[in-house]
Amino acid sequence: MSPNPSSTGPVIAPAPKGILDPATGRPIGANDPYFLEVRHELSDKGFFVATADDLITWARTGSLMWMTFGLACCAVEMMQVSMPRYDVERFGFAPRASPRQSDVMIVAGTLTNKMAPALRKVYDQMPEPRYVISMGSCANGGGYYHYSYSVVRGCDRIVPIDIYVPGCPPTAEALLYGVLLLQKKIRRTGTIER
């Protein structure tokens, strides 16, 4: 944006529009009942009252720690989400190396029969509440290798899945949208009982 020589005030960048929801064309969260209720209470009274469970749920959505379970080419697309162009950490979604420190596991790629026990073991090491994002056609249902004798036809046969991200491979935008949907799901339902 070029400065206007006739004005004496500072140059101000336009307000960020956020990531648009492809279904509505509006920024994600614009019609979220949670945010609408908070906005209404703040405009009405200047403060809002919440239960401790609501506060914990709100805090949990902004501090999700994720770990990768990258098995194939989808893991390369998953790496892009942490890079400066998408920067998933601005949404409170930070990577961790250990399952004991992680809230979310992203399964990306073809899950084979030999790798299935390792997936379950890593999932069991994660603390409660724990969430799983299945990324890509291979993780969702076997994908291109669906009819192979050595492939699990969807990682939901091994661990419970909260969000499915379709595509072969899905783009970084699709994974980012899946992360935002997971945060919305946690806000809406609180702790997901297993």
Curated annotation (Swiss-Prot):
Keywords: 4Fe-4S, Cell inner membrane, Cell membrane, Iron, Iron-sulfur, Membrane, Metal-binding, NAD, Quinone, Translocase, Transport, Ubiquinone
The record's free-text note on cofactor binding: Binds 1 [4Fe-4S] cluster.
GO biological process entries: aerobic respiration; electron transport coupled proton transport
Keyword check for Iron-sulfur: yes
Top-rank taxon: Bacteria
Entries under SUPFAM superfamilies matching the protein: HydA/Nqo6-like
EC number: 7.1.1.-
GO cellular component, one term: respiratory chain complex I
Topology with respect to the bilayer: Peripheral membrane protein
Described purpose of this protein according to its UniProt entry: NDH-1 shuttles electrons from NADH, via FMN and iron-sulfur (Fe-S) centers, to quinones in the respiratory chain. The immediate electron acceptor for the enzyme in this species is believed to be ubiquinone. Couples the redox reaction to proton translocation (for every two electrons transferred, four hydrogen ions are translocated across the cytoplasmic membrane), and thus conserves the redox energy in a proton gradient.
Protein name (database record): NADH-quinone oxidoreductase subunit B
